[in-house]
UniProtKB/Swiss-Prot annotation:
Xref: CDD domains: GH38N_AMII_GMII_SfManIII_like (cd10809)
Function: Catalyzes the first committed step in the biosynthesis of complex N-glycans. It controls conversion of high mannose to complex N-glycans; the final hydrolytic step in the N-glycan maturation pathway.
UniProt organism field: Drosophila melanogaster (Fruit fly)
Induction: Inhibited by swainsonine and by copper sulfate.
Enzymatic reactions: N(4)-{beta-D-GlcNAc-(1->2)-alpha-D-Man-(1->3)-[alpha-D-Man-(1->3)-[alpha-D-Man-(1->6)]-alpha-D-Man-(1->6)]-beta-D-Man-(1->4)-beta-D-GlcNAc-(1->4)-beta-D-GlcNAc}-L-asparaginyl-[protein] + 2 H2O = 2 alpha-D-mannopyranose + an N(4)-{beta-D-GlcNAc-(1->2)-alpha-D-Man-(1->3)-[alpha-D-Man-(1->6)]-beta-D-Man-(1->4)-beta-D-GlcNAc-(1->4)-beta-D-GlcNAc}-L-asparaginyl-[protein]
Protein name (record): Alpha-mannosidase 2
GO BP, one annotated term: mannose metabolic process
Regions crossing the membrane: 10-30
Source species taxonomy: Eukaryota, Metazoa, Ecdysozoa, Arthropoda, Hexapoda
Active site: 267 (nucleophile)
Length: 1108
């Protein structure tokens, strides 16, 4: 009986093994193994026979198999087996974004630590290696599926302006695309830039529009990303990235009835995780990127990790992951997309056959595909495809077919299509290739990849971090464009706030004639969106193109100002009095942050006189969803002015002189000059959440009771008189010396003889913390590669700017004090108002060619090689200074701030404009101010950067003790601002808007709007409030984007007594829904029409519908 049981057990075990081995054979025909082992199928029957005679042989076979696997794993194979893949948990409640360190397969900061960054010649793939593949990897049941994707990259401004490109190139490309796609049903084409497509479509006749909709509907023409532009990812703010995406996708939905879910970013110079964050929350499923460091491409390719699930650095659950495809080679042009050998791939760019004026740099031209050569040409091309496929995990391969402004001529369409169709026909018909090739779209490729994933071919790794700073070869790091053309970068941030304010102010009401408001808002959104282009805000376009961007943004600023002042008058004038006049300017906007040139005389001066105009109404607007108290200033014609609210309650004010700085050619110094006709009045305004507050300025015949006057001290040798008109305090003079200043209960700041900050004392009983400001300059190399608009290639460490003994102006008042100094190329001002000091640099690099000016802060903070910079104003990421990389590689984009810290102290520099910066030594921060370069850096621009304009940079400096704060683990890749730093950043990017009433008397004026609005928690912001429907619609829809940042908790947590419910900000709500960030897809109908609370580091969108 025992023998029978043994025999029965043997039969059962043998049967199971037979089943498992059969399944193994079937699956092996369907999917390749991750390793390069070749199974010996001829021995399978012998093995089964042996198993039937006894299981004792099984153990020996398993030992042999393990030995073979060990041998394979020890081979010198550049492609290593994939790592274990972290699985994403289901979304749940709010994540702990501080204490829980996210677990991912690839963390970019850790990867940078491990990588050697050795630039080894890889052969035909210079930055890679000699790829080999198993010729038996594919079979009839497991073919290589190749999608050849025709595309044309159209820059909305670079060498030519938007309109020049459109007239010369883009309209011809799109016109021919319509014709050839309509006539050739198998042909496909993808398009990214909706700014161009919208321009083209609106010029079409009705029949052509119907044809266009037809080829979109049948999938021949596919829109990728669908943004207004393909945005820069380094300097852009996340709100502007979302703005241009919404603008483009809204147009596509309205006119084409499509919403892309696959993104295509082939040309931005480095990639930010902010992009997948916004895309994923806008309904995207997949994205593609190209420009990443060549060493990163090689490292990920070796691991077959070029396709991954890109997570946010705080995400420990996978809620934010977006599937991402990274292109493996040098460029997105045809020579670098079919495979690793550009000499071979160039032969399959049939526009380079000679008649088009293009050729292959490798001296082997393409040939027309014929019956005589199709076999040999197919062998050559399939070999490249299969080598490229080795870098990815599935049997699906993407082959982009295009370049800048391609497919312009009819003949180009024909020559590419006909030759590839001949290749496809031959390749697909030859069984030995085991390849199925066709024209396709990006979405078709991703669909096939995920189908292979579901079939069990592959699991994809998780990755977190960013892809800055980009290098395309050797030590050519693209960190110069973080600063190039800073005047226009500054303009971008000013316009960003104006668009937000104009949309918010106009969303509260709908009134007759609203169409004119809507037109101006659309104009402003589209011009700001256009500037997000990766040759716009980057400062990497030709001079006349930069001028065009500037003019467009100036018009956008005017459009916003028109909307804002009309809306303020509507909101603060009693309904019984209000009568709209859209051609009239009810208010003048006053902004000391702009113009970017810092020319103070361009600001409006309020003319007051007892007989002419004894008083003037001024209004402040707060775009933030909580009460704000902030100092504001105006220019007035008399120093004897008092301030009251509309109920005639006095407000404490301070008057100071208005100073301008001038070059003295004789003494070669920069010195101040006081105005004799205008003065600054400063007072603290209190403004409701997302609301308005009115104040009144009134002239007096003498010093008003509640107005104080600042004293002024000029520290210089050989003083001269400085008349200040009616100002009641004379200027005092003194020899250069160190000084200290404090306002109210704020910190005490100590300054050197040269007017530069030396130290900060946080409280009167605490020690001074050294914080030394310095100005330095970088030079350029005398030979070889040189710095230009894109590249930062310094000739060594920065050298000090010779300051000499500059003139220092000290202004001291109850509400505001300041120290100003005229330095070579910079008028540097430190302003104290009782909190974090404000730094203003009026930078004029003049004619200092091949010079890059930097501001450096030196402290005793023991920060080591760690510092933090922000990404697109959305998040802060940990950086590590790497000595194995050159100086320029350790420079990063600083869109809104950076900080260093040790166990006790943190120093944060917040910036009101995007620039480049770093921490090149422990305890240091530095940020570039401007760069003037005579040479082209050989990246296609064809010029240097010599069109510099004076620019006003504004910063806030926050020094604080953090020893009692809850901080992330040392292993966490994210950093978070404190409450004080967050508020300082908001004051830079979204200050109070200031309006001066244009008329002498305001009949029906109301003192406030928004006093009944709920005040949100300090970490929550209503980043977007926009009317989505035309004013004529019966049901009005308003969209909101809420963002909640995570603030580092220090001390007692803030109590939140009020909850912000955007669904009920406007009356008569009929419906409220949670949507994608672009407002185009409803995700959830909110029962009870109450918006749920937003989690830390989350962004959510809602649309409320209201009856008119």
């Amino acid at each position: 009986m025992l023998r029978i049981r043994r025999r029965f057990a043997l039969v059962i075990c043998s049967g199971c093994l037979l089943v498992f081995l059969s399944l193994y054979i079937i699956l092996n025909f369907a999917a390749p193994a991750a390793t390069q082992i070749k199974p010996n199928y001829e021995n399978i029957e012998n093995k089964l026979h042996e198993l039937e005679n006894g299981l004792q042989e099984h153990g020996e076979e398993m030992r042999n198999l393990r030995a073979r696997l060990a041998e394979t794993s020890n081979r010198d194979d550049p492609i290593r087996p994939p790592l274990k893949v972290a699985r994403s948990p289901r979304p749940g409640q709010c994540q702990d974004v501080v204490q829980d360190v996210p677990n991912v397969d690839v963390q970019m900061l850790e990867l940078y630590d491990r990588m050697s960054f050795k630039d080894i010649d890889g052969g035909v793939w210079k930055q890679g290696w000699n790829i080999k593949y198993d010729p038996l990897k594919y079979n009839a049941h497991h073919k290589l599926k190749v999608f050849v994707v025709p595309h044309s990259h159209n820059d909305p401004g670079w060498i030519q302006t938007f309109e020049e490109y459109y007239q010369h190139d883009t309209k011809h490309i799109l016109s021919n695309a319509l014709r050839h796609l309509h006539d050739n049903p198998e042909m496909k084409f993808i398009w990214a830039e909706i700014s161009y497509f919208a321009r083209f479509y609106h010029d079409l006749g009705e029949n052509k529009k119907l044809q266009m909709k037809s080829i979109v509907k049948n999938g021949q023409l596919e829109f990728v990303t669908g943004g207004w532009v393909m945005p820069d990812e380094a300097n852009s703010h996340w709100r502007n990235v979302l703005l241009q995406l919404t603008e483009g996708q809204t147009w596509l939905k309205q006119f084409m009835n499509v919403t892309p879910t696959a993104s295509w970013a082939i040309d931005p110079f480095g990639h930010s995780p902010t992009m997948p964050y916004i895309l994923q929350k806008s309904g995207f499923k997949n994205m593609l990127i190209q420009r990443t460091h060549y060493s990163v491409k090689k490292e990920l390719a070796q691991q077959r990790q070029l396709e991954f699930l890109w997570r946010q650095i705080w995400d420990n659950k996978g809620d934010t992951a977006l599937f991402t495809h990274m292109m493996p080679f040098y460029s997105y042009d045809i020579p670098h997309t079919c495979g690793p050998d550009p000499k071979v791939c160039c032969q399959f760019d049939f526009k380079r056959m000679g008649s088009f004026g293009l050729s292959c740099p490798w001296k082997v031209p393409p040939r027309t595909i014929s019956d005589q050569n199709v076999a040999a040409r197919s062998d050559l091309l399939v070999d490249q495809w299969k080598k490229k496929a080795e870098l990815y995990r599935t049997n699906v391969l993407l082959i982009p077919l295009g370049d800048d402004f391609r497919f312009k001529q009819n003949t180009e369409w024909d020559v590419q299509r006909v030759n590839y169709e001949r290749l496809f026909e031959h390749i697909n018909s030859q069984a030995h290739f085991n390849v199925q090739a066709q024209f396709g779209t990006l979405q078709e490729y991703f669909d096939a990849v995920h189908q292979a994933e579901r079939a069990g071919q592959a699991e994809f790794p998780t990755l977190s971090g960013d892809f800055f700073t980009y290098a395309d070869r050797s030590d050519n790091y693209w960190s110069g464009y973080y600063t190039s053309r800073p005047y226009h970068k500054r303009m971008d941030r000013v316009l960003m706030h104006y668009v937000r304010a104009a949309e918010m102010l106009s969303a509260w009401h709908s009134w007759d004639g609203m169409a004119r408001i809507e037109e101006r808002l659309e104009q402003a959104r589209r011009e700001l969106s256009l500037f997000q282009h990766h040759d716009g805000i980057t400062g990497t376009a030709k001079t006349h193109v930069v001028v065009d961007y500037e003019q467009r943004m100036q018009e956008a600023l005017k459009a916003c100002q028109m909307v804002m002042q009309q809306s303020v008058y509507r909101l603060l004038t009693k309904p019984s009095i209000y009568s709209p006049d859209f051609s009239f300017s009810y208010f003048t906007l006053d902004d000391s942050r702009w113009p970017g040139s810092g020319v103070e005389d361009s600001r409006t001066t309020i003319i007051l006189g007892e007989d002419i105009l004894p008083s003037k109404h001024v209004v402040m607007h707060n775009t933030l969803p909580h009460w704000r108290e902030q100092l504001v200033d105006f220019y007035v014609s008399s120093p004897f002015v008092s301030v009251t609210d509309l109920a005639n309650n006095p407000v404490e004010a301070q008057v100071s002189p208005v100073w301008s700085w001038h070059h003295d050619t004789l003494t070669k110094t920069i010195h101040p000059q006081g105005s004799t006709t205008k003065y600054r009045i400063i007072f603290k305004a209190r403004v409701p959440p997302m609301g308005l507050a009115t104040y009144v300025l009134t002239i007096s015949d003498s010093k008003p009771e509640h107005t104080s006057y600042a004293s002024n001290l000029l520290l210089r040798k050989n003083p001269t008189s400085l008349p200040l008109g009616q100002y009641p305090e004379d200027v005092k003079f003194g020899d250069p010396r160190e000084i200290s200043l404090r306002v109210g209960n704020g910190p005490t700041l100590a300054f050197s003889e040269q007017g530069l900050l030396k130290s900060i004392q946080l409280t009167q009983d605490s020690p001074h913390v050294p914080v030394h400001f310095k100005f330095l300059k970088y030079g350029v190399r005398s030979h070889g590669d040189r710095s230009g608009a894109y590249l930062f290639l310094p000739n060594g460490p920065a050298s000090p700017v010779e300051l000499g003994q500059p003139v220092v102006l000290v202004t001291k008042g109850k509400l505001e004090s300041s120290v100003s100094v005229g330095l070579p190329s910079v008028v540097h001002q430190t302003i104290m108002r009782g909190g974090a000091p404000e730094i203003r640099n009026l930078v004029d690099i003049g004619s200092l060619d091949n010079t890059e000016i930097v501001m450096r802060l030196e402290t005793h903070i023991d920060s080591g090689d760690i510092f933090y910079t922000d990404l697109n104003g959305l998040q802060f990421i940990k950086r590590r200074r790497l000595d194995k990389l050159p100086l320029q590689a350790n420079y990063y984009p600083i869109p809104s701030g950076m900080f260093i810290e040790d166990a006790n102290t943190r120093l944060t520099l917040l910036t009101g404009q995007p620039l480049g910066g770093s921490s090149l030594a422990s305890g240091e921060l530095e940020i570039m101010q401007d760069r003037r370069l005579a040479s082209d850096d050989e990246r296609g621009l064809g010029q240097g950067v010599l069109d510099n304009k004076p620019v006003l940079h504004i910063y806030r400096l926050v020094l604080e003790k953090v020893n009692n704060c809850v901080r992330p683990s040392e292993l966490h890749p994210a950093g978070y601002l404190t409450s004080a730093a967050h508020k300082a950043s908001q004051s830079l990017l979204d200050p109070l808007d200031k309006f001066i009433f244009a008329e002498n008397e305001w009949i029906g004026a109301q003192g406030q709007f928004g006093g009944d609005h709920p005040s949100a928690r300090e970490d929550l912001d209503v980043s977007v409030m926009r009317r989505l429907t035309k004013s004529s619609a019966k049901t009005q829809r308003v969209g909101y984007v809420l963002h909640r940042t995570n603030l580092m908790q220090c001390g007692t947590p803030e109590e939140h007594t009020q909850k912000l419910d955007v669904c009920h900000l406007l009356p008569n709500v009929a419906r409220c829904e949670r949507t994608t960030l672009t407002f185009l897809q409803n995700l959830e109908h909110l029962d009870g029409m109450v918006a749920p609370e937003v989690c830390p580091m989350e962004t959510a969108a809602y649309v409320s519908s209201h009856s008119s």
